[in-house]
Structure formats: C-alpha cells, structure tokens
C-alpha cells in the first residue's frame, strides 16, 4: 500500500466550549451513548442470549474480547479524526491516504453490509411491535404491516429538526428501560452461578449444542459485537456535536466510556438471564419464540412484553440513525473514490444522498418482513455476523497504519509501541474471526437445514 501525497493543514478552530464541571461533562455526553445504542441492535441481544442459552457461560470470554476490541477500535477511529495533521474529520479520508483504492473497496462492501444490517433492524422492530400489539395484522402479513409503520415513523423523523437530539434522548430512555427490564428478570431468576461466570472468562470451546456450532457462536459474537462497521459512524456523531480538533480528545474518551458501560451491562444481563434459565434445562434458543418462552418462564406473563419492548427499542434506536450513518459512509467512499469532491463540498450535498437513504436503506429492507423470510435469530446469527466480518480485516489494517504513522498524526500523537501491539492483536483477532466465520458458514447452514 502506498500513501498519497500529503500536505499538512491548520486544524480549524471551533467555537464550542469544553465543559468545566462534572455536570457539564455529563450533559455533553451523547455520541458514545447514541453509538452504543446504535450498536445494541438485535445483533448484540440475539448473539448474547443465544450464546448464554445454548452454552451457558462457556463462551463469555468472546463477549469480553468483543467489547474491549470495539472500545479500542472506536477510540482509535476517533483519535485519527481529532488528531490527524491534515484536518480530516472524515475517517474515509484517512483510509484514502493509506491506499487510494480503500474508498471504492469500502464503499462496495459497506453498501452490502448496510442492507443486511438494516434488514435485521427492521425485522426486529417489526416483530417487537407485532408481538406487543397482540399479533395485530395476522400471522402471515402482521410483521410486514408493522414494518411499514416503522418505516413511516423513520421517514417522519427525517423531516423534523434536531434529529440527533431526538436520537440522543431515545438512546438514554432505551438504555434505562433495557437495563431495568433485564435486571428485574435477573432478580426473578433468584440465583447466579458466580463460579461458572468466572470460569467463562477463560478461553475454551465447549461441545456443540443447539442449532448453532460453538465456534460459530464464538466468532459471530466477536464479529457482531466487536467488529461492526457501525464503528465508523462515531466521527459523524462527533461532528454533529461540533467536536472537531484535538482539544476534544479527553471529552471524547469519557463520552465513549459513558456509552460503552451500559452496553457492557446490558450484554452481560442478556447473557446471564439466558445462561441461568435456559442452559442446562434441555432447551435451546433457535428463534424468537424461544426468546419469548425464556422470558415467560422467568417473569411470567409480563416477560414477553419486556422482551419485545427491549427488542423494539434496540432496533429502533438503530434503524433511523444507521440509515443515515451508513449512507453517509457509502457516499463518503464514492465522494473520495472519484472526483465528486470537486462538485460537492460534502458527500451529504449530493442530491442522490437522500434518495438512496430512503429507497435502499429505509424502504427496501421491508422485503425481509414478507412471508417466508428468515426469522429474527437466523438473520442475526448468520446474516449480520457474516456480512460484518468481511469488512473487519481491511478496516483494522488501515486503522493500524493511519494512526501509527508519524506523517499522518499531529506531533507526539502517533501510536506508541504498546498501542501498535494492541491494535496488532485486535487485527489478528479480527482476521481469525473472519476466517472462522467463512470457513464454518456453509457447514453451519447445512447443519441447520
């Protein structure tokens, strides 16, 4: 790979004032939580619950690896956008400086991944509403009709002001409801296998159980939770808050921590409830009906309602924001791959931006809610994990190169040796998980069929 010719520029100054009090910092937080709730779509919920139900705590180490990898990965993405010497506030610009072909390469991959991910979010949200409203619409077309409702609400949000503020508020509410719901479920369980929990933090693969292989659950958890292409959306959320330039690095790190903590708690709660209730009972989780049965056995008649509320909130905090975020990434790739930057100041100025966002990433995903489409669990375990894993290795390698080169970063801000080693290990884990997902994909499909 060869870098393009570089020219250092002055970082533009931004008038947004940094907070000076604890209350000020807390009120400033938002991008990290919005991003975390964007991540915390059904991929996390389903991956953690299926792993806990089918394998107990034996694969808990994959969750730790996934969340640590994600946290560091996002942090270094933010580091480049805040502390590069060129004034780039678009991560795609950095990838282009590593290799001219990256924007087009990423654009093609992300376009495919985004559609699969949006389909999983829309189906999850529609299933949640369908179940919450007593299966209104019938078994055949009910989920499809509720998907139209979600699409309509999303389109309405697009024409309202302060979209980001609405998403930030919804993310805060959703995180509280989800933590509260599964904490209540955990209290109702009444027991916790602490020794099993601690043992699950050590590496190892158990015997296969349920419809999904242990190795496939392990790598899909790492891929779906740790290596999501949604990691690339964080700079866009920072720009929406006006965080441009190195002075926001400390605030950004605290914000990311603020967002990742509830994500960790929610994932552990999903996992623990499933491990304590389903694992060892002779049952497994293969579809959304099994998820509902699990919550019924724990909480009683209110259990499924809590589950469907969580599933709806997890998907709906993701579907609108990722339609814009993914589309922005794709157009940024197209923008920097050719000469469109000579015609439009930003990728969002392209008149095709809104058209593609609406047609491809809001309306087209409706097809996954039609009769005969894959169920919620199958779509997330097989579809989302495979799609996201394909982007992970080049994403990590490019990030390693751009943040480690002194010619790319402000003086003293290039990765030190320990940071290079850390990113190198994360990159190797990403490459391994991609290899294992691809290697086991067809074997897993044949096993299910």
Predicted regions and their residues:
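Juxtamembrane transmembrane-helix boundary signature
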Residues: 35, 62-96, 105-119, 321
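Extracellular/periplasmic helix-exit of transmembrane alpha-helices
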Residues: 72-83, 238, 261-290
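Hydrophobic transmembrane alpha-helices that form the core helical bundles
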Residues: 102-137, 315-333, 376-377, 431, ...
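Membrane-water interface regions at transmembrane-helix termini and the short interhelical loops
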Residues: 127, 131-136, 151-174, 185-186, ...
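Transmembrane alpha-helical segments of multi-pass small-molecule transport proteins
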Residues: 133-160, 176-183, 348-367, 392-398
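Membrane-interface loop-to-helix entry segments
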Residues: 158-189, 385-391, 415-420, 425-428
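Hydrophobic alpha-helical segments and their helix-loop junctions in multi-pass secondary transporters
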Residues: 176-208, 215-235, 395-408, 433-445
């Amino acid at each position: 790979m060869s870098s393009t010719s570089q020219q250092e520029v002055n970082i533009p100054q931004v008038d947004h004032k940094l907070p000076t009090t604890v209350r000020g910092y807390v009120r400033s937080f938002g991008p990290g939580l919005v991003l975390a709730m964007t991540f915390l779509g059904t991929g996390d919920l389903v991956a953690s619950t299926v792993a806990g139900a089918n394998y107990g705590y034996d694969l808990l180490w994959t969750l730790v690896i996934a969340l640590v990898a994600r946290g560091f990965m996002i942090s270094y993405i933010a580091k480049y956008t805040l502390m590069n010497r060129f004034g780039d506030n678009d991560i795609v610009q950095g990838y282009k400086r590593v290799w001219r072909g990256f924007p087009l390469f990423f654009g093609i991959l992300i376009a495919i991944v985004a559609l699969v991910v949006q389909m999983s979010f829309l189906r999850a949200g529609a299933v949640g509403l369908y179940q919450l409203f007593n299966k209104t619409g019938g078994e055949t077309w009910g989920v499809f009709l509720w998907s139209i409702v979600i699409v309509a609400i999303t389109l309405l949000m697009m024409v309202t002001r302060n979209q980001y503020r609405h998403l930030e508020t919804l993310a805060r509410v959703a995180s509280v409801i989800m933590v509260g719901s599964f904490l209540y479920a955990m209290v109702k369980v009444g027991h916790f296998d602490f020794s099993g929990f601690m043992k699950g933090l050590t590496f190892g693969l158990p015997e296969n159980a349920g419809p999904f292989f242990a190795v496939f659950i392990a790598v899909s958890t790492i891929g779906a939770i740790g290596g999501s292409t949604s990691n690339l959306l964080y700079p866009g959320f920072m720009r929406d808050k006006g965080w441009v330039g190195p002075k926001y690095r400390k605030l950004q790190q605290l914000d990311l921590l603020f967002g990742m903590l509830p994500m960790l708690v929610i994932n552990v709660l999903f996992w623990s409830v499933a491990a304590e209730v389903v694992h060892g009972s002779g049952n497994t989780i293969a579809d959304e009906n099994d998820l509902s049965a699990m919550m019924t056995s724990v909480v009683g008649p209110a259990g499924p309602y809590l589950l469907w509320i969580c599933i709806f909130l997890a998907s709906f905090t993701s579907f609108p924001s990722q339609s814009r975020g993914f589309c922005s990434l794709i157009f940024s790739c197209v923008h920097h791959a050719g000469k469109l930057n000579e015609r439009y100041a930003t990728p969002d100025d392209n008149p095709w931006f809104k058209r593609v966002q609406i047609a491809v990433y809001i309306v087209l995903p409706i097809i996954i809610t039609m009769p005969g489409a894959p169920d919620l669990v199958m779509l997330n375990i097989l579809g989302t994990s495979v799609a996201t894993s394909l982007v992970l290795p080049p994403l990590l390698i490019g990030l390693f190169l751009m943040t480690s080169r002194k010619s790319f970063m402000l003086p003293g801000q290039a990765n030190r040796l320990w940071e290079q080693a850390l990113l190198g290990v994360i990159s190797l884990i990403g490459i391994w998980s991609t290899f294992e997902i691809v290697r086991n994909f067809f074997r897993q499909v044949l096993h299910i069929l």
